[in-house]
Amino acid sequence: MTSLISRTGRVQSWIDDPTSRLPVSCTVFVVEDSMEGPNGIEASWRFVSHALRFGAGCAVHLSKIRPKGSENGKGLTASGPVSFAKIYSTLNETLRRGGVYKNGAVVCHIDIDHPDIVDFITTPRGELPWIKRCVNLNDAKWKDADQTTKDALIYGIRSGDIWLNKIKHDKNGKRIRGNVCLEVYLPSRGTCLLQHLNCGACKITDVSKGFVEGMRDLCDLHSKTGVDSSGEYLPSETDRQVGFGLLGLANLLRQNNITYEQFGDALQATNDGIPGLGTAGLLAAEFYKGIQGAADVAREYNMDRAFAIAPTASCSYRSKDLEGFTCTPEIAPPIARSVDRDSGTFGVQTYNYGDVEIASEVGWDAYKKVADELMYMLQHTGLLHGYSFNSWSDVVTYDEQFVEEWL
């Protein structure tokens, strides 16, 4: 029978060979404003090297580094965070090529109120070819940003060079940092295991069971990885989070003749405490039941955060629905019913999703409603990391209003 759970390639590789890639998908490092020290700039180079060599995506947060041209009081002048971003780009270019599928990613983050923010945003892509750039912000920081910064940021988003990340804090008020794909929030040196409910492999009555079983399996694995043995990552005893998410939603909806629009309405009714009607209502209720059950499991394991909707393309390609079609990534409708994956490692492979609703048929509003209502459901568990949410550039206008609505 098709598995209800889709493991990440990292987890499966680790199970098959614990000496190779580690099972954690992502990690973060907050760089202190010092060359030396356990969390200084030099330490960050070793940390990024370790993450890449063992298969994790690494987010490097640079906001604590002094701006370019400032002096440290000892006669030394700072070169600024952008100069160090170039080193991480070179590390990624070199190390990701040296091993079997150790193709981790690096994203450099900086807060919108850093003095070097415009330099960070406008650095030509050719100078930072092997990293992504992300700007961290919240309502207050956005409102305080000057017009030059806002204009540069909007242009960077439009051109595809800049990602946005919401500034978040944990339940104790301590800041947690966005990972590479922006769906997981971690303390510095923290890591996260990811796993997904294969919605396409579920009948409606399987959904809640899949949520609970998948979360329990993931939480049980969390204590067994030993990822802290190198001294680079936090130990599982104190680093308390996992990321359980979804893929193949479009397949599940197709198999039950439910449209995205119908499912969004049913989710909204469920969140409002109104029993949904028809098959869509039954499915929405099953999602609610499953999410609550999975949250109870995560609390049993004392997890601080436990849900994350990740960009699951590679994992979805290995996942099948009940009719044998490839499962679609995460919860969004696909652009087309088949996709060609052109990989330097595996060559060109074609995957067929079956007769699912595609993005042009669903429409932005219907998809966003499904995303918003699912996020509302997950948020109210108190255990949500986030969703690696992609806007649709052909229907969305990137302007200040876009940023404000996103915030």
Q: What residue ranges belong to the model's regions?
A:
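Long, C-terminal-biased catalytic regions of enzyme "large/alpha" subunits
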Residues: 1-407
